[in-house]
């Protein structure tokens, strides 16, 4: 039981660290983002959305699976929360004057990542 609690804490910490990273990367100016991540190839932005949202989903879903035998209720809220967070961040980008803009394809990439993370959390067994 102690190792399960430790694993739950690990997934929770990694998930919140990832959510913090998503928020920072989403809310810094376009110029600062380009200096921070100088990679310039087609769709690097979408790949980032898939990977970061996928990892957050994986971490929180893994945590929910470890905490409860009936994790489907929690997982629905995790998925909904991450989708909502992505939409709110896109709206903030649209309303801000930081050189960032709303992109529906970012929301699609977020959703793909979230559902991939959820699926992997189910398919990959815990220790």
Task: Cite the ranges covered by each PLM segment.
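"…centered on the first transmembrane helix and the immediately adjacent amphipathic helix/loop
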Residues: 1-63, 78
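Membrane-helix interface segments
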Residues: 9-10, 70-77, 100-104
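Small-polar-interrupted transmembrane alpha-helices in polytopic inner-membrane proteins
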Residues: 15-26, 74-95, 111
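Short helix-capping/hinge motifs at transmembrane helix termini and TM-loop junctions
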Residues: 28-29, 65, 97, 125
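Interfacial helix-loop-helix junctions of multi-pass membrane proteins
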Residues: 34-36, 87-112
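Residue-level marker of motif borders
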Residues: 40, 44, 81, 85, ...
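Membrane-interfacial alpha-helical segments at the cytosolic side of multi-pass membrane proteins
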Residues: 52-67, 112-125
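Extended, folded domain segments that form the structural surfaces/walls around functional sites
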Residues: 81-85, 105, 122-127
